[in-house]
Amino acid sequence: MTSAPVQTDILALAREQVLERGDALNESQVLEVLQLPDDRLEELLALAHDVRMKWCGPEVEVEGIISLKTGGCPEDCHFCSQSGLFQSPVRAAWLDIPSLVEAAKQTAKSGASEFCIVAAVRGPDERLLAQVAAGIEAIRNEVDIQIACSLGMLTQEQVDQLAAMGVHRYNHNLETSKSHFPNVVTTHTWDERWNTLRMVREAGMEVCCGGILGMGESLEQRAEFAANLAELEPDEVPLNFLNPRPGTPFGDLEVLPASEALKSVAAFRLALPRTILRFAGGREITLGDLGAKQGILGGINAVIVGNYLTTLGRPAEQDLDLLVDLQMPIKALNDTL
């Protein structure tokens, strides 16, 4: 009678595969991590931190974001209060160039190396691109900081224009796994987003692509999303946690439990051992102050400081003080050039 094969513990396997060899966990392995009981969370976070330190180093990249054009978006992303299709309190508004420059100055003062200009649109029109170009030129004249953009889906011509403006990194989130995406957005497809990201990479800009956890996806779909991102190989992955917005289709969803959110952070680190993994929106309501520390000691190596697009973040000083306490240096601007 043959005995059943001995099952290798997923964290022991991850230690040998990811920490020692630098080989990412695959989709089924990520699912095993996500299914771990809460009593193994501390062990999981410690492993994810070790992986981050070995393959990324101790530095933390700091970024600020600003909304150039807020609200009035024609798309129906179910999590977003900036959609013009929902009964949310956000109304369309434009930011003027002097305010944009001042925001960039304040971001740079925090020690940030990256400043991202965001617009709530399906994709940019000529007016928006002209405003972005003027904003980038004005910022460059007064502030020493890398500039990123997040302007929705792009044509090849628009990609080339942004590259010519000197945009360092372009953010366009896939938001969730390919199989779950139709439950989140119906006015465009996951493949349309993927195509924009492909063109951005081919134009020589860095690719920033992540999403939001806690939008009703199953653990299987969360593991699928990690695998989708691993296939894309982005330079940066921002991890958001759903902060349900009043008036949106997802306004009544439950906030992700903190233990599940932290488990997800660690799992994504094990799926993306060399990628910039950024704490983004929703971490305050999902994790609180203690969770910020646990996340940075559990695989995270980048943060957005200050407020987000339509929700409040932690004061920049709190995050920066935390990095000092943890003896984690802020990534300097000259390290990103």
From Swiss-Prot:
InterPro entries tied to this protein: Aldolase_TIM (IPR013785), BATS_dom (IPR010722), Biotin_synth/BioAB (IPR002684), Biotin_synthase (IPR024177), Elp3/MiaA/NifB-like_rSAM (IPR006638), rSAM (IPR007197)
What pathway is this protein a component of?
A: Cofactor biosynthesis; biotin biosynthesis; biotin from 7,8-diaminononanoate: step 2/2
Q: Which cofactor does it need?
A: [4Fe-4S] cluster; [2Fe-2S] cluster
A single GO BP: biotin biosynthetic process
Give me the residues that bind [2Fe-2S] cluster, please: 116, 149, 208, 278
Q: Which domain of life is it from?
A: Bacteria
Keywords (alphabetical) are:
2Fe-2S, 4Fe-4S, Biotin biosynthesis, Iron, Iron-sulfur, Metal-binding, S-adenosyl-L-methionine, Transferase
The UniProt entry, under SMART domains, shows: BATS, Elp3
Q: Is Iron given among the entry's keywords?
A: yes
Question: Known catalysed reaction(s)?
Answer: (4R,5S)-dethiobiotin + (sulfur carrier)-SH + 2 reduced [2Fe-2S]-[ferredoxin] + 2 S-adenosyl-L-methionine = (sulfur carrier)-H + biotin + 2 5'-deoxyadenosine + 2 L-methionine + 2 oxidized [2Fe-2S]-[ferredoxin]
Q: How does it assemble?
A: Homodimer.
Q: What is this protein called?
A: Biotin synthase
Q: Which organism is it from?
A: Rhodococcus jostii (strain RHA1)
The major lineage groups are:
Bacteria, Bacillati, Actinomycetota, Actinomycetes, Mycobacteriales
State the gene name recorded for this protein.
Answer: bioB
